[in-house]
A protein has these predicted regions:
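Positively charged n-region of N-terminal signal peptides that target proteins for export
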Residues: 1-5, 110-112
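Acidic, two-metal ion nucleic-acid-processing modules in DNA metabolism proteins
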Residues: 4, 17-20
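A ubiquitous, low-specificity "background" feature that marks scattered single residues
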Residues: 8-9, 180
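Hydrophobic h-region of N-terminal signal peptides that target proteins for export
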Residues: 9-18
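Subset of outer-membrane beta-barrel
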Residues: 20-315
């Protein structure tokens, strides 16, 4: 039994390491009304300077499980552009990474009467990745001589199309290959590119309705090992003037195992005045379920008033 537990833990730590390496792990943070974390094209959209702090603790109950903290902020610049910044700290067992992302987006109006817009975004990424061998059990392995660390400079590009309440974004992350001079090129992939597609629609029964339904889909493809995952989401919002409350569900699965979800996550949150709170609890539905109580995702935020743009492409 003990060997089975160790095997399962090692398996999922390995999978998480692949998702973790040189990028911010994408779980359900974007559903906390913060799609900027997955694409630079959302920089500056809205009439506020948006600040979001996120804490993510995976696989509660398993020692050295992944743990992530991030700070994201974006704001409008001029009438048709936006800038953003993302800082993150991520640990998974003996692997650690810290990074920053600086983003710029420009927003164009295709049809101002139909609220049809196109946005283009680019990000510069800085990442420090480290494998710490201090706590390795077998220090006599000749192949393990010291810590392994690398610094990566990279770029993201993205495009966003919006028409009325519909949106569709496509993003390519980490365009440049990784420097393998400090790693074994036989076992270490050098392709870091990830591809994201995010689309959804915000539906109201009538213009004056207090309730809004937002179904959405988030697709990720990892070039390093050919994996791909899909999120199916639905959110319900209830408005009270400029405040709102929401609740929903996030369903994630590997695309070759549609009927076997990785997790199902209830989500809820609220925006009151300029303050924001969001929470998600991911119920793990695979073999690790017997050893973990799940994953917690907490988001706190504040929207600082900036003033409306004269261009509807920024709304």
């Amino acid at each position: 039994m003990r060997n089975t537990v160790l095997t399962l833990v090692l398996l999922f730590v390995t999978l998480a390491s692949k998702g973790q390496e040189l990028t911010l792990p994408q779980l359900s943070q974007y559903l906390a009304d913060n799609p900027f974390v997955i694409s630079p094209t959302y920089s500056g959209i809205g009439d506020h300077i948006k600040i979001r702090i996120n804490g993510l603790t995976q696989w509660v109950g398993i020692k050295d499980a992944p743990d992530t903290q991030s700070l994201a902020a974006d704001a409008r610049v001029g009438e048709k552009s936006g800038i953003g910044m993302l800082l993150y700290n991520d640990s998974n067992g003996e692997t650690k990474q810290r990074g920053a992302r600086l983003s710029f987006a420009h927003h164009l109006t295709l049809d101002r009467y139909d609220d049809e817009f196109m946005s283009f975004g680019i990000s510069y990424n800085f990442n420090q990745f480290r494998i710490d061998i201090e706590n390795f059990r077998d220090n006599n392995d000749a192949s393990v001589t010291d810590d392994r660390a690398t610094t990566n400079h990279n770029f993201d590009v993205g495009i966003l199309y919006r028409k009325d309440k519909f949106y569709l974004s496509a993003n390519a992350s980490n365009l440049l290959d990784k420097d393998l001079t400090k790693f074994n090129p036989v076992f270490e992939p050098n392709r870091l590119r990830n591809y994201y597609i995010y689309t959804g629609y915000r539906y109201k029964k009538s213009k004056n309705s207090d309730m809004e339904i937002e179904p959405s889909v988030f697709f990720q493809y990892f070039e390093s090992d050919g994996r791909s995952v899909t999120d199916l989401n639905v959110k319900f919002r209830w408005y009270d003037f400029e405040d709102y409350y929401y609740a929903g569900i996030n369903y994630r699965f590997l695309n070759d195992q549609i009927g076997n979800p990785l997790y199902i996550a209830p989500i809820f949150g609220l925006k009151k005045n300029n303050f924001y709170f969001g929470y998600s609890y991911q119920v793990i539905l695979n073999e690790i379920m017997g050893f973990s109580t799940g994953t917690h995702v907490v988001t706190l935020g504040v929207d600082l008033f900036q003033g409306l743009s004269n261009c509807r492409c920024m709304y």
